[in-house]
Design a protein with these regions (language model features):
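Long, well-structured alpha-helical subdomains associated
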Residues: 109-117
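Short alpha-helical catalytic segment bearing the HExxH-like zincin motif
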Residues: 64-72
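Active-site scaffold of zinc-dependent metalloenzymes
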Residues: 1-64, 76-80, 87-91, 100, ...
């Protein structure tokens, strides 16, 4: 599913652990960067801002998949509305981010799961 975050288009893709790990190696080779150490890790979700893709493990139970999507969409929100730099956030800033992003993120999640939240 495609969605926009501050007029930047992203797509949500569900992949298995194996598919994601194979894709990461290919992407790293294409981008000319050091190959990611994905062999030993387990991913639930990952956001690739430069490619505009949010990956979610397709084998997660519905409740965990939903939480993971919210988590990844929060990364998108922070990147597109706040900053692309590493930053330490105070509790007050986190509360503001959560409150300000809630409707945007939950609308995308609702659309993705067809209202089955």
């Amino acid at each position: 599913m495609k969605f926009k975050m501050n007029d930047i288009t992203y797509v949500i893709k569900e992949l298995s652990q194996k598919e994601y790990k194979e894709l990461r190696v290919i992407e790293d080779e294409e981008d000319g960067v050091e190959i990611s150490d994905v062999k030993n890790g387990i991913y639930q979700g990952s956001t690739h801002h430069t490619k505009g893709i949010v990956y979610i493990d397709k084998n997660l139970p519905h409740e965990i998949k939903r939480k993971t999507l919210i988590h990844e969409l929060t990364h998108c929100y922070i990147r597109e509305y706040i900053t692309h730099e590493e930053k330490n956030y105070s509790e007050e800033m986190v509360a503001d981010i959560s409150a300000n992003s809630h409707d945007i993120i939950h609308k995308i999640v609702e659309d993705y799961f067809g209202g089955d939240n």
